[in-house]
Amino acid sequence: MSDSKALRVATIFSLTLLATTALAQTKPQPYNAAPWENVLYGAAYYNEYMPADLQPGRLDKDIALMKQADISVVRMGESTWSLWEPEDGRFEYAWMDRVVDAMGKAGIKVIMGTPTYSIPTWMYHEHPEVLVDLLTGPKPAYGMRQNMDISNPTFRFYAQRLIRNLVEHYRNNPDVIGWQVDNETGSYNANNPEVFTGFVDHLKQKFGTTDNLNKAWFLNYWGQDVNGWENMPPRQNATSTGYKLEWSRWQQMRVTDYLSWQAAIVREYRRPDQFVTQDFSDAVHRDVNEFEVAKALDIVSVNPYHGTQDHMDGQIQAQAGDYYRSLKHANYLVTETNAQTTYWASSFQYPPYDGQLRLDVYTHLSSGANMVEYWHWHSIHSGQETYWKGVLSHDLEPNRPYAEVSRTAHELQKIGPQLIDLKITNQVAILYSHDSLNAIDFMPFASTGPRWTFGPASADYSSEVNQLHTALYNLNVGTDFVFPEDPDFSRYKVLIVPMLYIADDALLQKISDFVKNGGHVLMTFKSGFANENSAVRWVRAPGPMREAAGFSYQEFSNLEKPLALKDDPFHAGTDENKVSYWAEFLMPEHAKALAYYDHPFFGKWPAITENNYGNGTLTYEGTYLSDTLQKAVVEQVLKEASLTGPDQQLPAPVHVKHGVNRQGKQLHYYLNYSSEAQTFTYPYKEGTDLLTGNAVTSSAKMTLQPWDVAIVEEK
């Protein structure tokens, strides 16, 4: 950016801040809305995406269809900065006002998004420096969304100016109930000069001196000591695991700062009954610390996309719900999910079977969602997401999905007040570590490449977390997620600790204390191996966990091919009695072996151990288990914690979720993820199936049709 442009931006920024101060509330008020009366159900809506000749009259037709279907909420505005501000400093609202007003007259609520994730062409033309410098390559050309440096001061100037104008314009509109800041935000792999300068400032604050940094990162290796902050090398070719880990933390901090910054601006103007949220994409992220971002939000939202047809089993939705509900231990929103087919090409078009859209809605509600919205209302006719279809297809006419959405919405109008604000109390939690996710990615334990080469990882931290959650899900055990930052884990009976590769001594002590005080821990390999700076501990593994684990080890090995466990101790069967990728040579000191490798060399060491420590137990897996073995080990831990019962007797396609509704009554969701009817025995107190109105007695036989659901409210 030229000096004249920089001066112009700085001057405008200062004047804008002065001018907007009078508009902003002197003290932002906390979110304070009356409880919603019903579950919200709707879709993202983009009248502006319609073919130009359809736009004027299409709005009324869409609203008529929405009213006929009992749609109650739409999300709008987050994708079209160029319409809000077609040229620098000229703001247009009429195009959206007509939509918001029409929705309001129809009784449909609006969530408005800040449109900052896709910059307009005029900004790129005037300020190409706002584009991200990729860590992995050159600056990209304009054309893709999410291609800017979110910490760039020029970008931030334009973003804050737009946000202030937008929120001020709609703050008094009673139909706008909330604000979504940005959209599926990430760091975008940014390596701009300002990003690196900020990183060095972060290191100064954290480590104080370069001498402390050198010691923490062991930079005397290969003679890479940093002698003066001005000599800090760039990230691109860094080999230090400490450097790479801290850089990943810095990228997470940038995202937290950016979204907190947007949320703070919105709060200056919004009404106290307008919430602030962010729609996280469905997966957990290497460059986003959702736990920290959630502190800046009133409500957490997530966009979970999932398998359809024969690949819909509810696990993806359940894991997303469990994770995002756990961030604030509160109900959450689903801001996007499958309407019809998904994907950016026509090579992955699998529309849902009859019943799957409806089942998906109740799946989310059973995990604690208070809103379900589709992406999106109507399919678009051109662009990258042409084949990411909405409720209406490209012909914009009512169709099979619309009929199912209508059926579901009509049901929610009747029973939604008994479903909203479901309170879920679980006794099992998975400890999730962003640091371990990234550090294991830097030093993978499983590779598809031949020896001495680096191929794509065939298993990693995420696959282990997913496997463990799937085991719990398939056992019908409600699950929360906890994080290293949580003060303690005492609310749970069982703590699942997947590959806690990065941990300071305090976190490991907290886990040991949990066991000592009567908790049950299932911990998997690589846990306790490295400290908070990704340096391997200089004591025998598993470091501070040694006493609680009851073993130590000095060696480990990759496994070139899967090994069986001797005598199939968990009755997994020949095909599934297998472990892969990695084996730690566990030497029991107090622990007992639960399984040994069936191998002439590896067979001298246990693959799985269990140790009684204090009033609790710690079960440890020194290798990567098959899915069937993992489920069996998890089930054994649950039995020892007295957490099994009738829910584990359900037929495999049926899943059950429990919670207490706003009226203080226990709800039991039964969900059939199969194309066949399923019959089972209802084991709880008598109640009423809210969807049919039928009485349900204890020990009664219940039958669910394919892709069907029952919701029993106890008396």
Spans of model-derived segments:
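Aromatic-lined substrate-binding rim segments of carbohydrate-active enzymes
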Residues: L59-P138, Q262-Y269
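Bacterial N-terminal signal peptides that target proteins for export
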Residues: M1-T11
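The substrate-binding groove and active-site-proximal loops of carbohydrate-active enzymes
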Residues: Y41-L54, S79-A94, A141-Y158, T185-N189, ...
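N-terminal carbohydrate-binding accessory modules
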Residues: Q25-V73, P86, D101, Q418
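Polysaccharide-binding and catalytic clefts of secreted carbohydrate-active enzymes
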Residues: T136-I299, N303-I316
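Carbohydrate-binding surfaces of carbohydrate-active enzymes
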Residues: P272, Y305-K715
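Aromatic- and acidic-residue-enriched carbohydrate-binding clefts of CAZyme catalytic domains
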Residues: W36-L40, G77, W84-A94, P120-P153, ...
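Short, acidic/polar
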Residues: P51-M66, D282-V293, Y353-V361
